[in-house]
Amino acid sequence: VPPGFTPFRVD
C-alpha cells in the first residue's frame, strides 16, 4: 500500500 493511500480517496 503506497503512503497516503486510502480506498476511499487518493489525493
Swiss-Prot record:
The keyword Secreted applies. The modification 4-hydroxyproline is found at residue 2. It is found in: Secreted. Keywords: Amphibian defense peptide, G-protein coupled receptor impairing toxin, Hydroxylation, Secreted, Toxin, Vasoactive, Vasodilator. Its main location: secreted. One of its GO terms (cellular component) is extracellular region. One of its GO terms (biological process) is vasodilation. Expressed by the skin glands. One of its GO terms (molecular function) is toxin activity. Produces in vitro relaxation of rat arterial smooth muscle and constriction of intestinal smooth muscle. May target bradykinin receptors (BDKRB). Belongs to the bradykinin-related peptide family. This is [Val1,Thr6]-bradykinyl-Val,Asp. It comes from Pithecopus hypochondrialis (Orange-legged leaf frog).
